[in-house]
Amino acid sequence: AAEAIADGVITENADNAKLQPELNRTALLWNSWQDHAIGADILCYMNGYKDPRMEKMFLANDVGDYVGIRIGIDVTSKSQAMSKYSNMIVASDTPYLWFNAAEATFLHAEYELRWGSAETAKTLYEQAVRLSFEERGASGADAYLVDATKKPAPYTDPLGNYSASARSEITVPWETATDGSDTEA
């Protein structure tokens, strides 16, 4: 990791690794076949945090909510169920994204947290969030990064069978552990 960082990594969205296909075939999976839905976990975090990127990334369900599907549930009627869950926004001309500046910056932050400086890790974490907001065309990154009150939402299954409590109490702002646990392997 240190060598890659020293040699230079993606730091701007203009350098994101994308491929513009003639036809994005994943659009068939999401839009035509209706075989996929967004995972419940990501939407519980994003709903709880009131994340502005959500509407840039996902389609709301048939009643205007953002709801993911839990892994392994029993769906007896695909046609009934799929309208209840959110879908990815992807069009036939959407480029394939292999790697982006936000992910590179998050990974750099993890490296710094483990082998470098917690303060540098904090700065990189915040920069990664800002890059993600910028890539999605969402506003409000600075307010998002300092909101220490919002937490992941519990999961309410729109079909009523698989609801669950929130998986975490974590908030968005960076907090450095005072006991050194943030740098342990």
Task: Give the label of every model feature segment.
Residues 1-140, 180-183:
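Structured, solvent-exposed acidic/aromatic patches
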Residues 133, 137-140, 145-185:
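C-terminal functional modules
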